[in-house]
């Protein structure tokens, strides 16, 4: 008697807590082993790029908040950076420093969600509670400076919307001084946990060559040992004035991808501290017309967001509205290698591998 075996098709999502949003993976399984994984994004597609063609250049800014809604400040920055390049606008120094402070706070907030949610994915809910407790302080700081917590719409073409309010610097300094202690707690709760290490170490190892071939960026790339951070290799704004290190992994496995984010939070705190010490007095916005009409042309600019390289391509026809806006979304690009990363691993590992990439569906689907 012969036993017939066949591959099994399983839909993971779109409504599944570990997909961090409405995201579906069609898994082909041989027993419990993944043979093939097809990501099916698009459930949160809102047609943002098309909508922007009928908005003025300033009206575009709130839409960028809704890309990576866990790092709204950085999404704002990526867009205004491209328009400023097109218009050849010189940004006041004070505005540049404010951008760095809120941008790095946004990076820390995003990484706090990534590390806490990753622990919860693997079964350790306690770490999630601790990281969200500390992220709340950043949300309060954003509310102080912009009036909003999650969708700040804080950046403006030529600078920022508001100057630093009273009490902000003191509260921000208190937070960055406290952060190293918080990270020690995360290391105790999450990093040093034997079960967490067993689920993440040597799982879904990614080589530097493959990461470069697939145009991966951010912590996913640097976990493979590739020393590529735009703030260092192609400094924008005033980043060349700050001393900080670029944390790198050695194996490129799930653990490295997780741990890189913890180390990056420490470096972001260093940058914020230096920016607060060095910030000059002066205007917070360049003198540009109220009605923004960039010259006919195109520009592409990139920033280092929390997920990787966020690029914005803007085409101007000389009117008050962009002819075309396109975003290079790092989560979307990083997700392109998911099939290769999942192949050969057990279904239980799928959650650990997907969580290590740290995707945000607002940015993936746009």
UniProtKB/Swiss-Prot annotation:
Its main location: membrane. GO terms for cellular component: plasma membrane. It is an enzyme of class 7 (translocase). Keywords: Cell membrane, Membrane, NAD, Quinone, Translocase, Transport. Belongs to the complex I 49 kDa subunit family. NCBIfam families: PRK06075.1, PRK12322.1. NDH-1 is composed of 14 different subunits. Subunits NuoB, C, D, E, F, and G constitute the peripheral sector of the complex. This is NADH-quinone oxidoreductase subunit D.
């Amino acid at each position: 008697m012969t036993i017939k075996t066949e591959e099994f098709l399983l839909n993971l999502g779109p409504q599944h807590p570990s997909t961090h949003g409405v995201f579906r993976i069609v898994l082909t399984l041989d027993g419990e082993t993944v043979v093939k994984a097809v990501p099916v994004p698009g459930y949160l597609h809102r047609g943002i790029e098309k909508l922007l063609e009928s908005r003025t250049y300033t009206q575009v800014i709130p839409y960028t908040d809704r890309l990576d809604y866990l790092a709204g400040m950085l999404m704002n920055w990526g867009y205004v950076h491209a328009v400023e390049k097109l218009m050849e606008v010189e940004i006041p120094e004070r505005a540049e420093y404010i951008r760095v402070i809120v941008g790095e706070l946004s990076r820390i907030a995003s990484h706090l969600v990534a590390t806490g949610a990753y622990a919860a994915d693997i079964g350790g809910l306690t770490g999630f509670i601790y990281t969200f407790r500390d992220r709340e302080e950043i949300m309060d700081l954003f509310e102080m400076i912009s009036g909003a917590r999650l969708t700040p719409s804080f950046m403006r073409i030529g600078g920022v919307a508001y100057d630093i309010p009273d009490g902000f610097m003191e509260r921000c300094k208190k937070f960055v001084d406290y952060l190293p202690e918080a990270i020690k707690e995360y290391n105790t709760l999450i990093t040093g946990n034997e079960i967490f290490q067993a689920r993440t170490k040597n799982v879904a190892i990614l080589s530097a060559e493959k990461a470069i071939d697939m145009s991966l960026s951010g912590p996913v790339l640097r976990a493979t040992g590739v020393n590529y951070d735009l703030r260092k290799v192609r400094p924008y704004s005033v980043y060349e004035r700050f001393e900080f290190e670029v944390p790198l992994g050695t194996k490129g496995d799930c653990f490295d991808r997780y741990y890189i984010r913890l180390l990056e939070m420490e470096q972001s705190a260093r940058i914020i501290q230096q920016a607060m010490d060095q910030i000059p007095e002066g205007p917070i916005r360049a003198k540009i017309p109220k009605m923004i009409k960039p010259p006919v042309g195109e520009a592409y600019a990139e920033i280092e967001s929390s997920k990787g390289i966020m690029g914005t391509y803007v085409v101007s026809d000389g009117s008050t509205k962009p002819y075309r806006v396109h975003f290079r979304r790092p989560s979307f690009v990083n997700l392109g290698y998911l099939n290769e990363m999942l192949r050969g691993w057990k279904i239980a590992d799928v959650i650990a591998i997907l969580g290590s990439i740290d995707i945000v569906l607002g940015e993936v689907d746009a």
